[in-house]
Regions:
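Nucleic-acid nuclease catalytic cores
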Residues: 85-112
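Non-catalytic C-terminal interaction segments of nucleic acid-processing enzymes
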Residues: 4, 31-34, 38, 98-100, ...
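Active-site-adjacent loop/helix micro-motif of nuclease/hydrolase catalytic cores
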Residues: 41-42, 67-79
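Alpha-helix C-cap/termination motif
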Residues: 35, 53, 84-88
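Beta-rich catalytic cores
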Residues: 46
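Acidic-basic catalytic patches of nuclease active cores, encompassing PD-(D/E)XK
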Residues: 1-42
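Conserved catalytic cores of phosphodiester-cleaving nucleases, focusing on short active-site segments
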Residues: 50-67
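Short amphipathic alpha-helical segments and helix-helix/interface helices
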Residues: 29, 78-82
Length: 173
């Protein structure tokens, strides 16, 4: 991630407080749409955070962001992810912490591999990362943040929903 992108995310974090995670999730959804995924659904409230079709496969993402250098997985998170694996989906954890030089980690979820109730740095997720998928969004995410961070700061979730509506592959749950 470019230094400028980190700086813009820091501005976003300072401006919106607790809404930061949901806004970054929407920015990630927009970045995926920029890479021409199919049938992307973004959920801001309950259930799967992002669900999309990539190369004909159903892929689901639990998005974890943090204002610190770690994230926390809850038992509820893992139970839901376990069910999705059983249903045959490709399941990922999309992790972005606020540690210096951190970038998105898109880690394939493997049941039993991640502890709950602990603060986890990005390190444990690295063993399961999908580098091809990460490469797919890196440039797009920088571009999306550059273009849409002002909308996120000034118009919040409703503003980013307006951006999402401009993509034919987007759908709301």
């Amino acid at each position: 991630m470019k230094h400028e992108t980190h700086a813009k995310l820091a501005r976003l974090r300072a401006a919106v407080g607790r809404e930061y995670g949901k806004l970054v999730q929407k920015l990630l959804a927009i970045a995926f749409l920029e890479t021409e995924v199919q049938k992307l659904v973004e959920r801001s409230t309950q259930g799967i955070d992002l669900e999309m079709e990539i190369a004909g496969e159903r892929c689901v993402f639990e998005v974890k962001t943090s204002e610190s250098d770690s994230v926390r997985l809850t038992p509820k998170d893992l139970e839901g992810l376990d069910r999705l694996v059983e249903d045959g989906a490709r399941v990922y954890l999309a992790v972005l912490t606020n540690a210096p030089f951190d970038d998105w980690i898109l880690a394939r979820y493997v049941p039993g591999e991640f502890p709950t109730g602990k603060n986890l740095t990005s390190f444990p997720f690295r063993a399961h990362r999908d580098r091809d998928l990460e490469q797919r969004i890196f440039t797009a995410f920088d571009r999306v943040v550059d273009r849409d961070v002002h909308t996120a700061i000034t118009r919040r979730q409703g503003g980013l929903d307006g951006v999402l509506q401009g993509y034919p592959a987007w759908g709301r749950a």
